[in-house]
Amino acid sequence: MCTDNETKVIDPEFGFYGPMGFDIGMLISNYLMAYFSQPGHRDSEKLSEYQNWILKVIEETFETFRQEFKKLWNSERTGILFPSSMFEDQGDSSDFALNAMLEHIWQDAVAVCGIEMHRRVLSLAHNADFEEINDTKKRSKLEARNLMMGRELILNNKSIKNASELTSLAKKFNSENYL
């Protein structure tokens, strides 16, 4: 909060400098926690439709991010890391560098997503999607699925190549036979 005379920091623990994939990873983690918690909030008739919608939102969100990043890369890229003078000004494409950067951002996002899925279940900053499930047996099962998915994302962030693979993995961990 800033005024002409003073600046106050609220929740300074959230002041952070980190990987480019941090914000998109945090967003996806919240989508996934909503996805995994839904059996505690909906009847089976509407459950599948809603969960599939959440997974579609994840895929569309990252694709929108990718397209916007690509647009900005091509129109507003400045600085010393990937200057146009090294690529376009030499008659070369910067697509390889762009794709490498997007892959790196995705890998960071996947790992951050998994970490946040753990933090929101295991720390003091609980997730309302799970906390509001009154049936503790059901809640613990859904939280366990969430934690197992988060573990997979942390340990295998480099092998999950895109949002479609991530949502397929979510379906695997969400199956009735899992746990």
Region spans (language model):
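Active-site acidic catalytic loop and adjacent metal/ATP-binding pocket
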Residues: M1-I24
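Domain-wide signal for the mature, well-folded portions of proteins, strongly enriched
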Residues: M1-D4, L27, E49, R151
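Short amphipathic alpha-helical segments, especially helix-boundary/capping motifs
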Residues: T3-N5, Q38-R42, S93-L98
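Regulatory N- and C-terminal appendages and interdomain linkers associated
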Residues: S84-L179
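Active-site activation/catalytic loop segments of kinase-like enzymes and analogous catalytic loops
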Residues: G21-G91, C113-D129
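Glycine- and acidic
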Residues: V9-E13, H41-S48, E103
